[in-house]
């Protein structure tokens, strides 16, 4: 509730079986095309929250993400602890850098969706994001999928992601996870078998 005045969300407050898929992208190691293939197969929209170097290193992937109907969101230029940033100018720089890179690659303005690195924030951060026109999205379901040399097994991933899913969940997955690349198609099928449907965060930002 304290987040709502700042246009910030952890989840959708609903009893409907809706899932909002999001991916945090720090760099590319070959999994994003697999993720996009699975999303396309299931006609599932997603938001990819990217840092600056992800755009500059992977312009073709950015174009594919957009052309397949997904949204590219802002995960800051350099992935700092944003709660330590107290000046609007420094805060704006972190977001504008990404937005400018995105526009240079796509020719379009970036959707103003923001996710703070590691979910760390201060109330003044949330106010600054709102003042800059951003909707801030945290998450209600995630698992430890980002450690490269300790990737969860398929069974571990399913156990965590299937048992903890809930109506209105904003799901955070990392694009760098080999496990996610391998299981996403099957995971989406399993959620569909549980009568969940995939929705875009655009719906939340417009309520």
How should these model regions be labeled?
Residues 1-86, 96-103, 110-111, 203-206:
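Active-site beta->alpha N-cap acidic-glycine motif
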Residues 26-33, 56, 85-92, 119-120, ...:
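Soluble non-cytosolic domains of exported or imported proteins
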Residues 34-37, 60-67, 93, 97-100, ...:
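Alpha-helical scaffolding segments of alpha/beta enzyme cores, especially the outer helices
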Residues 71-78, 119, 173-176:
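Histidine-centered catalytic micro-motifs
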Residues 120, 125-164, 196-207:
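His/Asp/Glu-enriched short active-site or ligand-binding loop at hydrolase and phosphoryl-transfer sites
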Residues 166-202:
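Catalytic grooves of carbohydrate-active enzymes
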């Amino acid at each position: 509730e304290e987040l709502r005045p700042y246009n910030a969300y952890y989840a959708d407050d609903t009893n409907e079986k809706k899932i909002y898929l999001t991916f945090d992208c720090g760099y590319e190691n070959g999994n994003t095309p697999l993720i996009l293939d699975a999303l396309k197969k299931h006609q599932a929209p997603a938001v990819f929250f990217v840092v600056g170097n992800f755009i500059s290193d992977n312009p073709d992937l950015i174009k594919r993400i957009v052309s397949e109907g997904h949204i590219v969101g802002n995960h800051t230029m350099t992935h700092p602890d944003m709660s330590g940033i107290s000046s609007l100018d420094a805060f704006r720089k972190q977001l504008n850098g990404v937005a400018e890179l995105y526009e240079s690659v796509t020719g379009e303005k970036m959707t103003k969706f923001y996710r703070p690195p590691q979910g760390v924030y201060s109330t003044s951060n949330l106010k600054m994001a709102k003042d800059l026109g951003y909707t801030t999205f945290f998450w209600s379901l995630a698992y430890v999928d980002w450690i490269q040399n300790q990737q969860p097994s398929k069974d571990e991933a399913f156990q965590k992601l299937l048992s903890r899913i809930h109506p209105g969940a904003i799901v955070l997955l990392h694009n760098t996870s080999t496990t996610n690349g391998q299981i996403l198609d099957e995971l989406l099928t399993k959620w569909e078998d549980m009568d969940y449907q995939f929705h875009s965060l655009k719906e939340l930002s417009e309520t």
